[in-house]
Amino acid sequence: PFVAPLGKFARLVLKVCIPAAVVILAVVYPARVASTSSDITYYYGTSHIFGSDTRLGQDMDKVKEVFGNSDTYVVLVPRGEVSEEQALSNELKALPEVKSIQSYVDVASPYIPTGMAEKDTLDLVEGEHYSRLVLTVTAPYEGPSTFKLVKKIRCIADKHYPGKAMLAGEGVSTTDLKDTITVDKGKVDLIAVVAVFAVLLLATKSLSLPIILVLVIETSIWINFAAPLYTGMHEFFLAYLIVSSIQLGVAVDYGILIADRYREDRVTMHKREALLETMEACTIPVLTSGSVLLISGFLIHAISSHGVLKQIGWFLGVGVSISLVAVLFALPGFLYVLDGLIGKTTLKAHFLPKDAQDPVSDTTEASAADGSAQ
């Protein structure tokens, strides 16, 4: 009694579902390419978590304005090769981003035997097996310029100490994280799609429904994360991981709910009536769950000053909105158009044949006739 009839909405879905499905097919490839574009800038570390609208972000911006960007790297090389260490230090100093170097050959002298150096000084730059070069660089903690600088330093160190030099530092860690993620991201995405397909295959007992659902679900995710390419937004990779997982799970639930209800209704109804009945029955549960998530996401975005949380809220709100539109409008279009294929590729579907009478319609007509007779 508290829920308005959804017959009008169901009829609206029936009118627009096929064009909506065509739109999904039209944007699936561009959305996939855009969401995985190398032109999207990801933040992997913590240096951009607090923006200029926070006190901490303003203080950090002021420090950078006065002193510039600064980071510290450490190069570890095998101990005892003083001449090679000197050559390495000289070549690193030639890099414009390297502000200073602290090492044995720089603090003391390559001509002074280590046995004659002061122990306190020696302990700062020499270990039992390795010598340490501490580099102060004028580079941010992460970003394209940092990634290029780390690559240059690694190439120089490997030239002097092939396979033996080691490099550490915040910018180095961020670069390693970026390189690892870049290689693994495609594999992880593929595994996620295969896993979702397998779950849907077991849940629907159909060969065609999992393909349809994965297409609609993944396209909605790709559309969500294609936006930064066109808006220039820098994307926190952690936000991408969290929101894409949530959006995937949410859309799978909605898709299974609608697909299963449609299959049940098709046993006793023709596809038009079954689709109308499905949308009347499933719209409220889907909208209730989805609206809670999208409102929560936008509230987190509006309230939080933490960069990652703020972006998680934004992508969650937008992503759930896209998933709702895709599941409520495009998915019914695929179910309607591919009804015959679904019936043939689904285990024990028992869809009502085209030439069969609709039991629901017959019952309604019989009731109306009885009422008239009385």
Region locations from a protein language model:
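Membrane-embedded transmembrane helical bundles of large multi-pass transporters/channels
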Residues: 1-41, 158-374
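Structured non-transmembrane domains adjacent to transmembrane bundles in polytopic membrane proteins
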Residues: 41, 47-209, 215-230, 373-374
